């Protein structure tokens, strides 16, 4: 069976640097409901996820590949234990009323951050731009893949590359 690994290039993405685990799910927006969905997500994010102490939820639109035009919703956490923490009831109610009716859920995964292969420069800032690259490899190519990731990090460090790159592996 193929192993799925993700390299998440988070360009200048500081707000989740300490996050070690991401719970991600694909959201397939229903035909004709894109504007309502995007409006509901934007308002919910402004209301409930705009402070340092709020849950870390991020919603990204997928631009290319087989899931183009779908969205991925990610909840960043320090550890898997946080999955046991309930989401704020008002926040969940708002989501269920203003976003949930407009999509169906696709695949869901848990990702763990590989700190040894991630590159986060001290001088990086925060931005809304993200690039996610999924790599699929056969079991026989696992060592080659991780050697490649080590070399990418080394090159970034040696060149003084100023953007962040977080490497995650699929944990579920």
Segments (PLM) and residue ranges:
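Short S/T/G/P-rich N-terminal loop/turn motif that feeds into the first structured element of a domain
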Residues: 19-172
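Sec-dependent N-terminal signal peptides
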Residues: 3-16
């Amino acid at each position: 069976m193929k192993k799925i690994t993700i390299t998440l290039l988070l360009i200048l993405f500081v707000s989740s640097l300490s996050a070690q685990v991401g719970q991600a799910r694909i959201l397939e927006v229903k035909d004709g409901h894109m504007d309502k969905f995007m409006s509901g997500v934007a308002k919910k994010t402004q209301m409930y996820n705009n402070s340092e102490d709020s849950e870390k939820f991020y919603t990204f639109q997928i631009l290319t590949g087989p899931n183009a035009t779908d969205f991925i919703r990610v909840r960043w956490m320090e550890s898997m234990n946080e999955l046991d923490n309930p989401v704020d009831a008002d926040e969940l109610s708002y989501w269920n009323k203003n976003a949930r009716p407009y999509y169906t859920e696709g695949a869901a995964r848990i990702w763990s951050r590989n700190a040894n292969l991630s590159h986060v420069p001290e001088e990086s800032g925060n931005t809304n731009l993200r690039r996610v690259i999924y790599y699929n490899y056969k079991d026989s190519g696992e060592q080659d893949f991780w050697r490649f990731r080590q070399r990418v990090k080394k090159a970034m460090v040696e060149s003084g590359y100023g953007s962040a790159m977080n490497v995650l592996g699929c944990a579920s």
